[in-house]
Every structure is written in structure tokens, then in C-alpha cells.
Amino acid sequence: MFLIVGLGNPGNEYENTRHNIGFKVIDNIAKEYNIEINRQKFKGMYGEGFINGKKVMLLKPTTYMNLSGESVREVVDFYNLNNDEILVIYDDISLEVGKLRIREKGSAGGHNGIKSIIAHLNSEIFSRIKVGVGQPNGDLVKHVLGKFTKEETAILSESIEASTKAAAEIIKNDVKTAMNQFNGFKASTTV
């Protein structure tokens, strides 16, 4: 089984914030592959289904961002998963809105959700799709917990769709293939 985790914060007040783009991508994957995210366990909401004939679990941790690793660890332990069966999708402030970056491993880069996952897995080796949410002009917390502008929202729909395709490519083939295909991605709509 392959675990696909989208990072975000639970609660309506965070629903359309930059920090919750991982949840948005998971919702899009669920819609695309008819997977219902309607079960609660592992400190998260999840659903199981198939992508390209391979069994997957879509997980949205409900622990708040900084504790996401607790949820991921519970799934990994329960299903005895290896790190190469984990894909994490999350926001990246170092990328402009409309860009993606796929990686096989790496540091947290200041992202507290990834920091938590690395700590709970005791490893930086797991694949990830980073979705650009733009650089903050001032306060970082206000930026990541802020909502997207109308223009950015139009661009984001392309990023979400590309992230969905990239996740499917990782499941079907591998991370390197997805990197070659999507690391140069830039939404055609611009701000």
C-alpha cells in the first residue's frame, strides 16, 4: 500500500489558507480517483482506494500541522510501511504560486509539518510534492495562515491538478519520472 499524506490544519477557519494546500490536493486526488475520505483513525481522516491499480491510503492528519508526524507514524506502524511507500504533499513558501517541486528526500526547510514527520519517522527519506504558495512580504505566520487572492486561486487550480497527476505518476512509475515531468511545471495562468 502507498500512503499519500496532505498536510494542513483542521477546522473551517484554516480551510482555504496557504498552509492547507496539501489538504486541497488530497481532496482533488480523492475526487479524481473516487476515494472517499470519510474514516477517522490514526489521528486523521482517511480513505482507501486505488490509483493506477495500486492500493493507496489518502490521509489528512487532524493533529494540526506541527504534530503531523504523529498521524503518519501511526499509519506506518499499523500497515508496516517503508519510507518509499510514503508521499507527503504540502505548501512551500520558497516557490511562487503556480510552481511545484518534487523531491525524494531532504530537510524540513523550515516547514514544521515536515519537521514533525522527519522526527517521527527518524528519517528525511520519503518523497514529497511541494506546492508553491509564494514568499511572505512580512509576517510568515500571517502569510501561511492567510487566504489566497482571487488571482492566485485561479493559478492554484492548475497547481492542484498538476500535483494530482504528479502523485499518480509517482504511484505508477517512480519519483524520478515524476520529477522529470513536473519539476519544471509552471501554471499557465499568471498573477
From Swiss-Prot:
The keyword Protein biosynthesis does not apply. It is an enzyme of class 3 (hydrolase). Pfam families: Pept_tRNA_hydro. Keywords: Cytoplasm, Hydrolase, RNA-binding, tRNA-binding. One of its GO terms (biological process) is rescue of stalled ribosome. GO terms for molecular function: peptidyl-tRNA hydrolase activity; tRNA binding. It is found in: Cytoplasm. Its main location: cytoplasm. The record marks D91 as: Stabilizes the basic form of H active site to accept a proton. TRNA binds at Y14, Y64, N66, N112. It comes from the Bacteria. Transmembrane segments: none annotated. The active site is at H19. Its EC number is 3.1.1.29. Belongs to the PTH family. Hydrolyzes ribosome-free peptidyl-tRNAs (with 1 or more amino acids incorporated), which drop off the ribosome during protein synthesis, or as a result of ribosome stalling. Catalyzes the release of premature peptidyl moieties from peptidyl-tRNA molecules trapped in stalled 50S ribosomal subunits, and thus maintains levels of free tRNAs and 50S ribosomes. Monomer. This is Peptidyl-tRNA hydrolase.
